[in-house]
């Protein structure tokens, strides 16, 4: 069985370690755990590995956030992966820093990357793992906040939720979304 894991973010050195790029950071960690490297291909950086009989394809769109759906649609079609076998990793202002929430579907909640996915996939019914980045910004500064780098003290706290996100991705591919949601949304450690 094949799975497509889509990490949302922006390409370029200036966006590394920014809140908006947490999807890229999670995929970088997962690739490192499985000793695979990303290669540039059509509309994305891509890599893959096998896990418990499943093929996991990881993409980091090179289209920038606002056109992420274009890359997702291309790879879903090319690899012939059903939408329910995709998982999008996305930053979320509505969740506290480091909090993870797995959902089978939902609205974009104003997130441009998710809006793009909805536009290209023609549905809101695709699984997503929301990664809380907090909301410590003044009114009107949301854009600056999501494009800002994590503070040093936050960086030291990211390791645990990033590792947990990697476990959730693997659980999603082996146990399915319902059982994985029961575990991760209840804050039970995924083993």
Swiss-Prot record:
Site, Stabilizes the basic form of H active site to accept a proton: residue positions: 91
One GO location term (cellular component): cytoplasm
Record key words, sorted: Cytoplasm, Hydrolase, RNA-binding, tRNA-binding
Catalytic reaction equation(s): an N-acyl-L-alpha-aminoacyl-tRNA + H2O = an N-acyl-L-amino acid + a tRNA + H(+)
CDD domains: PTH
Subcellular location, record wording: Cytoplasm
Classification via InterPro entries: Pept_tRNA_hydro, Pept_tRNA_hydro_CS, Pept_tRNA_hydro_sf
HAMAP family: Pept_tRNA_hydro_bact
PANTHER family named in the record: PEPTIDYL-TRNA HYDROLASE (PTHR17224:SF1)
Its job: Hydrolyzes ribosome-free peptidyl-tRNAs (with 1 or more amino acids incorporated), which drop off the ribosome during protein synthesis, or as a result of ribosome stalling. Catalyzes the release of premature peptidyl moieties from peptidyl-tRNA molecules trapped in stalled 50S ribosomal subunits, and thus maintains levels of free tRNAs and 50S ribosomes.
Protein name in the entry: Peptidyl-tRNA hydrolase
Source species: Amoebophilus asiaticus (strain 5a2)
């Amino acid at each position: 069985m094949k799975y497509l894991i889509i990490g949302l973010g922006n390409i370029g050195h200036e966006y590394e370690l920014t809140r908006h790029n947490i999807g890229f950071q999670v995929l970088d960690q997962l690739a490192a755990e499985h000793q695979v490297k990303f290669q540039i291909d059509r509309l994305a950086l891509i890599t893959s590995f096998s896990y418990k009989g499943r093929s996991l394809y990881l993409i980091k769109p090179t289209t920038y956030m606002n056109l992420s759906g274009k890359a997702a649609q291309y790879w879903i079609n090319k690899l012939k992966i059903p939408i329910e076998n995709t998982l999008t990793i996305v930053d979320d202002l509505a969740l506290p820093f480091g909090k993870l929430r797995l959902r089978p579907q939902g609205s974009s909640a104003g997130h441009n990357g998710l809006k793009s996915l909805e536009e290209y996939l023609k549905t809101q019914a695709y699984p997503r793992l929301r990664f809380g980045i907090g909301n410590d910004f003044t009114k009107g500064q949301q854009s600056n906040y999501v494009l800002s780098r994590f503070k040093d003290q936050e960086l030291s706290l990211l390791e645990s939720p990033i590792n947990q996100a990697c476990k959730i991705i693997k659980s999603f591919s082996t146990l399915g979304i319902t059982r994985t949601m029961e575990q991760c949304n209840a804050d039970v450690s995924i083993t």
